[in-house]
């Protein structure tokens, strides 16, 4: 006889199940207490899942509100930066005009070399 082959009179029986079609164990008789416990567990699980989904939704809503608030604040701050930049430009121009005709700066007795100033606008603008 060759190895691995069944004897002539024996019959091999295999249960062939399609993939995904695992044979399901037959449910045993459950007592009413088991049924009640199962129903209570499912109800408790359902309530917990509902609570979790509600909490997740509330968290997302809160994050969205915070996002909107920060966007508004950001817009206000950008407007303020624009206004302050314009004010700085006007004041710088006024100072330059004043320096041209200021008698204290034009007096030869008060001749003090004034070092050139860096552009104040460039240092204030966001990069």
From Swiss-Prot:
Region named Disordered: 1-72
Basic and acidic residues composition bias: residue spans: 58-67
SUPFAM superfamilies for the chain: Leucine zipper domain
bZIP domain location: 35-98
Gene Ontology CC annotations of this record: chromatin; cytosol; nucleolus; nucleoplasm; nucleus; RNA polymerase II transcription regulator complex
Family the UniProt entry places it in: Belongs to the bZIP family.
SMART domains: BRLZ
PANTHER family: BASIC LEUCINE ZIPPER TRANSCRIPTIONAL FACTOR ATF-LIKE 3 (PTHR23351:SF13), FOS TRANSCRIPTION FACTOR-RELATED (PTHR23351)
Swiss-Prot/TrEMBL GO biological process terms: dendritic cell differentiation; integrated stress response signaling; myeloid dendritic cell differentiation; negative regulation of transcription by RNA polymerase II; regulation of transcription by RNA polymerase II; response to virus
UniProt keyword ATP-binding, yes or no: no
Localization: Nucleus
Residues covered by region (Basic motif): 37-62
Organism this protein belongs to: Homo sapiens (Human)
Cross-referenced Pfam families: bZIP_1
Main localization, broad class: nucleus
Organism superkingdom: Eukaryota
Modified residues (Phosphoserine): 2, 31
Role: AP-1 family transcription factor that controls the differentiation of CD8(+) thymic conventional dendritic cells in the immune system. Required for development of CD8-alpha(+) classical dendritic cells (cDCs) and related CD103(+) dendritic cells that cross-present antigens to CD8 T-cells and produce interleukin-12 (IL12) in response to pathogens. Acts via the formation of a heterodimer with JUN family proteins that recognizes and binds DNA sequence 5'-TGA[CG]TCA-3' and regulates expression of target genes.
Quaternary data: Heterodimer; heterodimerizes with JUN family proteins. Interacts with JUN.
Name assigned to this protein: Basic leucine zipper transcriptional factor ATF-like 3
GO molecular function: DNA-binding transcription factor activity; DNA-binding transcription factor activity, RNA polymerase II-specific; DNA-binding transcription repressor activity, RNA polymerase II-specific; RNA polymerase II cis-regulatory region sequence-specific DNA binding; sequence-specific double-stranded DNA binding
Region annotation Leucine-zipper: where it falls in the sequence: 63-91
Keyword annotations of the record: Activator, DNA-binding, Nucleus, Phosphoprotein, Repressor, Transcription, Transcription regulation
């Amino acid at each position: 006889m060759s190895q691995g082959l069944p004897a002539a009179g024996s019959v091999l029986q295999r249960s062939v199940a399609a993939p995904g079609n695992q044979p399901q164990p037959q449910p045993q008789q459950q007592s009413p207490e088991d049924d009640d416990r199962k129903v209570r567990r499912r109800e408790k699980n359902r309530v917990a899942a509902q609570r979790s989904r509600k909490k997740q939704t509330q968290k997302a809503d809160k994050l969205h509100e915070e996002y909107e608030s920060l966007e508004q604040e950001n817009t206000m701050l950008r407007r303020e930066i624009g206004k302050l930049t314009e004010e700085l430009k006007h004041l710088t121009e006024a100072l330059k005009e004043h320096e041209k005709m200021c008698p204290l700066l034009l007096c030869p007795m008060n001749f003090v070399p004034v070092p050139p100033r860096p552009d104040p606008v460039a240092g204030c603008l966001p990069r």
